[in-house]
């Protein structure tokens, strides 16, 4: 990939995704390569995306529990990633951050943007 990530589950410390509706997070887990197609529900139910899981997702709570302002909602994921990197995420703080995936979408899943953040060497 352009970011050099070959195995997202092993190489990403966390992900912030645009979970605007209940099935969206499940679909994104599959489309972003975190699990096989058709296994998104099982992957989420496994606890892998919860705090303490091997790929915490939406550590700030996500749009479904935080708020859903529409397309500008992606800024919440960016803000959370910055807080995590700075060590300012309080009870949500993750121990080891190397790479973080941020995802945004709009137009009813027709437009997507994904970026991978990492620490400077």
Residue ranges and their predicted role:
Residues 1-121:
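Claisen-condensing/thiolase-fold acyl-transfer catalytic domains that form or cleave C-C bonds
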């Amino acid at each position: 990939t352009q970011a050099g990530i070959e195995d997202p589950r092993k190489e990403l410390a966390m992900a912030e995704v645009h979970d605007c509706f209940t099935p969206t997070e499940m679909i994104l887990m599959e489309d972003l390569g975190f699990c096989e197609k058709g296994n998104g529900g099982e992957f989420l139910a496994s606890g892998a995306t919860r705090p303490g899981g091997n790929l915490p997702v939406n550590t700030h709570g996500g749009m479904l529990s935080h708020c859903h302002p529409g397309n500008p909602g992606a800024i919440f994921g960016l803000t959370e990633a910055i807080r995590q990197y700075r060590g300012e995420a309080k009870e949500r703080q993750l121990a080891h951050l190397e790479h973080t995936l941020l995802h945004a979408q709009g137009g009813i899943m027709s437009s997507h943007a994904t970026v991978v953040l990492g620490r400077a060497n």
